[in-house]
């Protein structure tokens, strides 16, 4: 006798696209660097942190506060992600698993607002902004001084109120994915 297993149902399966490769980023402002920051875009993969780590075994961080812009262009077609009429009723979500400290998200010109992300996950319904073909995702990552509206985590380097270096990198420091459900 033979054992038969059912075929995987593709129609209702959750689809995930990793958006970790080929980002462009640059700093628009950075404390302590006084104009010495990157003014031209560099290409990076996610996770990325603008705050460098220095010293023996790279345990001492640079305490970098500032703002960085991240841009990613990605192309979607039906064979990749089922966006057209064949996927009627599906919802599409961008999931950010860590952006330090605040993230302002724009997809194809639609502003999704500023969010206190930090070390938490942010999920946005982008169904109405996503399209077949080329899509442009822009993330403004901000890590200002004196953060007062986020949980404080001692980075081990200061007792100053609102001081969160060591706990919040400047950048997109965890995965970003697009999901269809």
Model-assigned labels for residue ranges:
Residues 5-10, 24-29, 60, 65-66, ...:
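Accessory beta-strand-rich segments of carbohydrate-active enzymes
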Residues 40-42, 79:
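Generic short amphipathic/hydrophobic targeting helices enriched at N-termini
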């Amino acid at each position: 006798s033979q054992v038969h297993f059912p075929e995987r149902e593709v129609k209702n399966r959750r689809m995930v696209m990793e958006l970790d490769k080929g980002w462009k980023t640059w700093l628009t402002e950075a404390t302590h660097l006084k104009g010495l920051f990157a003014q031209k875009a560099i290409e990076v993969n996610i996770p990325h942190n603008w705050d460098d780590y220095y010293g023996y075994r790279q345990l001492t961080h640079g305490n970098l506060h500032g703002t960085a812009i991240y841009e990613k262009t990605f192309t979607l077609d039906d064979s990749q992600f089922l966006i057209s009429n064949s996927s009627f009723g599906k919802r599409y979500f961008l999931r950010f698993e860590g952006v330090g400290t605040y993230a302002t998200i724009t997809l194809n010109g639609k502003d999704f607002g500023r969010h206190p992300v930090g070390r938490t996950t942010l999920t946005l319904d982008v169904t109405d902004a996503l399209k077949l073909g080329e899509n442009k995702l822009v993330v403004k990552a901000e890590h200002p001084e004196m953060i007062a509206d986020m949980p404080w985590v001692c980075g081990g380097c200061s007792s100053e109120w609102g001081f969160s270096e060591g706990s919040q990198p400047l950048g997109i420091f965890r995965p970003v994915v697009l999901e269809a459900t």
